[in-house]
Amino acid sequence: MIEIDWKTRNFYIIYLLKSRQYLLQRLKQIDSVQQSLHKDHSSTDFIIISFLVRSILEKQEQNIQELIRKFRDSTTLTDEKASLVQRLLDHTIDQLQTKLFTDEQLTLLRQILERHLMNRIYLLAFYPNGDIDQLRDQILHQQINQLSLNLSHNSKLLNIPTKFFTTSPWPSAQAELLLLSAYKTPRDKIQCIYRCCSHIMTLLSTSQNSIPSADDLLPVLIFVVIKSNTRSILSTIEYINTFYLNEMTGEQSYYWTQFCSAVEFIKTILHCNP
């Protein structure tokens, strides 16, 4: 009787295990379908909103041309340029029926609209002083390149804690900064910097049992900025400060402060060691 009872229980346990395995497989399939549907929904939103943006911008062409004219006018102040862009963005969004839009769709709408608009005025906004700005960026780029040749992660100049050496040279963070020039809007550029710092924080956290502090992040970020040596870094900082600084919040603002501090530290090094 005991043997029969044991076999019966054993069969039941096997049945439960197989049922559990079957349910887990089904849950995985359902999750995969949900993710696929979400991607399809996001793609559909992007296509529809992109079409709406192109349609409404065609009607705003006169206003866009006026914006371009004011950006070319040397008497237009920097703060005024930022206000002009924001007013045109807000005015254009007001032309659309956005009451039925979700918060996610409204965010996407503004991002797409920003990309279209900033693409039209990018060089005027990014290099307000034309060749002078480009020359200044080029000189700094060359100086950082020389500095990078003899700089390693264990340099006393940076004083990076040895416990973080195992994750150097932080290639994923460098790769993010190298993409900076590919983006045209200040929002997209700051997101690029945000991802760079996030990569560093994640890698540093694997080297210790606590969350890395600003004192941990900054020296590594300095190293990453030097080694990536992204072009037009000074113009990037001024561009973001002009057109996006007031919209930053939370971690985004924190990482931006760290990035600017890293660049200032590099400029100090170069000034002390010309």
Residue map of PLM features:
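Acidic, serine/threonine-rich, charge-biased low-complexity segments
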Residues: 1-107, 113, 272-274
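Short secondary-structure junctions and interdomain/linker hinges
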Residues: 75-78, 96-99, 124, 128, ...
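Short linear, low-complexity motifs centered on an aromatic residue
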Residues: 1-5, 9-10, 14, 130-142, ...
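Alpha-helical bundle/repeat cores within regulatory domains of eukaryotic proteins
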Residues: 189-274
